[in-house]
Structure formats: C-alpha cells, structure tokens
C-alpha cells in the first residue's frame, strides 16, 4: 500500500498532480484546494490512499494527515466512494466538515459535486459523533499537518487571475505552464509577476 509520497511536483492538472519520487512519476488525484497550493518544481509531501477497483487503479492524495483520515472515514459510509469523498474535502476543511455534521447541515455537505442531499444525510447519520472526525484539524505532536512551501509570487498571480473571474485550478495551471514554457525562475520574483500574469492570461484567453 502506498501511504505517502515525498518528491518533486512535475505538473499540476485539473484533477491530479504528478509527483516524481526517485524518478518514478505518481499521478495522484487530489482535492481542488490542495492542487491550488502546488506548482511545478515544488517539493511536496502527499498522504495517499490507493483505491483498487475492477477496471482502474487510482491514487488519492492529500497535503495533510487530517484530510486523509477524514477521507478514510467518509468512504466507510454506504454509497460514498473515494471520488465523492475527495470532492467533499475539496469544498470544505475537515473542521468545517465536522461542524456541518454536528449541526446536521446536510445543505452545506450537499454543495460538494457528485454528493447530493441523500448522500449528505447518510454521512450525517453514520458519522455524527465520530471521535476521529470531530478531532480533525488537530495539530498535536507528531500529527501536525504538512505545510508545503508557498511561492508568494505565484499565489499573487493566481489571485489576480481569480479576481478576473477565472477558476483557481485553471489559473494555477496557466501560471505553471507559463512559467515552465518561458523559463521563468522559481520561486517567482515580484518583478516577474506582472509578466507572468500577462503570459498566463494570454494562455487562458486562447483556451476559451
């Protein structure tokens, strides 16, 4: 079982990140919130779960242990598969999820793509009172969430694109590709940010 990957981020796509560990690339499906914190060339630690089915093998990943632990709780709920569980963790943090369950807030849970109100009600019914879930976001000794290196310049450009109406995932991917294709040094210097913003915006406009 592959429980964790530590290596270099080779690329970030809409739903996945490619992590190079010792020359082997692991395509890892991750929540949108985590993908938005990654960029090509960054070192990262990803906590993973390998899902085996009749027709596919999928590696799911998270940037902190709490999210993975809650993910494992969610996929134990009848009718909730790993894709939906990860979708839910892409719309709210473990602590927000725990609060929604405690408050019987099915509407908040149902906002996750692919879940629906019935699935949200099942989660509340089966996980309410779960010790592990209610202790999520606990940064106790030996279990502190991993904090990836943050490139302030990249974040600045991504935020600029988001403010113009682009989705964060699309903005992040465009910035990564613009930097890679134009040999922009990383971490991104503040002087390079306006240029990268123009390059990324041009890429996104062409893709419309």
From Swiss-Prot:
What GO CC annotations are associated with the protein? cytoplasm; Holliday junction helicase complex; Holliday junction resolvase complex
- Gene Ontology biological process terms in this record: DNA recombination; DNA repair
Chain spans, region Domain II? 64-142
Q: Mainly localized where? A: cytoplasm
Which Gene Ontology molecular-function terms are recorded?
A: ATP binding; four-way junction DNA binding; four-way junction helicase activity
- Show the segment(s) annotated as Flexible linker: 143-151
**Gene3D superfamilies, A to Z:** 5' to 3' exonuclease, C-terminal subdomain, DNA helicase RuvA subunit, C-terminal domain, Nucleic acid-binding proteins
List the InterPro entries. DNA_helicase_Holl-junc_RuvA_I, Hlx-hairpin-Hlx_DNA-bd_motif, NA-bd_OB-fold, RuvA, RuvA_2-like, RuvA_C, RuvA_C_sf
Compartments reported by the entry: Cytoplasm
- Region (Domain I), start-end ranges: 1-63
Does DNA-binding count among this protein's keywords? yes
Record keywords: Cytoplasm, DNA damage, DNA recombination, DNA repair, DNA-binding
Region Domain III: start and end of each range? 151-208
| Record's subunit section | Homotetramer. Forms an RuvA(8)-RuvB(12)-Holliday junction (HJ) complex. HJ DNA is sandwiched between 2 RuvA tetramers; dsDNA enters through RuvA and exits via RuvB. An RuvB hexamer assembles on each DNA strand where it exits the tetramer. Each RuvB hexamer is contacted by two RuvA subunits (via domain III) on 2 adjacent RuvB subunits; this complex drives branch migration. In the full resolvosome a probable DNA-RuvA(4)-RuvB(12)-RuvC(2) complex forms which resolves the HJ.
What's in the domain note?
Answer: Has three domains with a flexible linker between the domains II and III and assumes an 'L' shape. Domain III is highly mobile and contacts RuvB.
Function summary: The RuvA-RuvB-RuvC complex processes Holliday junction (HJ) DNA during genetic recombination and DNA repair, while the RuvA-RuvB complex plays an important role in the rescue of blocked DNA replication forks via replication fork reversal (RFR). RuvA specifically binds to HJ cruciform DNA, conferring on it an open structure. The RuvB hexamer acts as an ATP-dependent pump, pulling dsDNA into and through the RuvAB complex. HJ branch migration allows RuvC to scan DNA until it finds its consensus sequence, where it cleaves and resolves the cruciform DNA.
Protein family membership: Belongs to the RuvA family.
Name of the molecule in the record: Holliday junction branch migration complex subunit RuvA
Query: Which organism was this protein described from?
Result: Bifidobacterium longum subsp. infantis (strain ATCC 15697 / DSM 20088 / JCM 1222 / NCTC 11817 / S12)
Encoding gene, per UniProt annotation: ruvA
């Amino acid at each position: 079982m592959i429980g964790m990957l530590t290596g270099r981020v080779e690329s970030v796509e809409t739903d996945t990140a490619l992590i190079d560990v010792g020359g082997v690339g692991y395509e890892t499906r991750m929540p949108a919130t985590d993908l938005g914190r990654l960029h090509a060339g960054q070192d990262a630690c990803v906590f993973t779960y390998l899902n085996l089915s009749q027709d596919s093998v999928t590696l799911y990943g998270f940037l902190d242990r709490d999210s993975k632990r809650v993910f494992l709780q969610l996929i134990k709920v009848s009718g909730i598969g790993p894709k939906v569980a990860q979708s839910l963790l892409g719309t709210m943090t473990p602590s927000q999820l725990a609060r929604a369950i405690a408050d019987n807030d099915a509407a908040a849970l149902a906002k996750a793509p692919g879940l629906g109100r019935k699935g949200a009600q099942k989660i509340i019914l089966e996980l309410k009172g779960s010790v592990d879930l209610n202790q999520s976001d606990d940064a106790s000794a030996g279990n502190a969430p991993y904090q990836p290196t943050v490139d302030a310049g990249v974040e600045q450009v991504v935020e600029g694109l988001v403010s113009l109406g682009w989705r964060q995932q699309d903005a992040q991917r465009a910035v990564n590709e613009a930097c890679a294709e134009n040999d922009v040094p990383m971490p991104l210097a503040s002087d390079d940010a306006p240029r990268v913003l123009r390059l990324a915006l041009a890429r996104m406009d062409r893709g419309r």
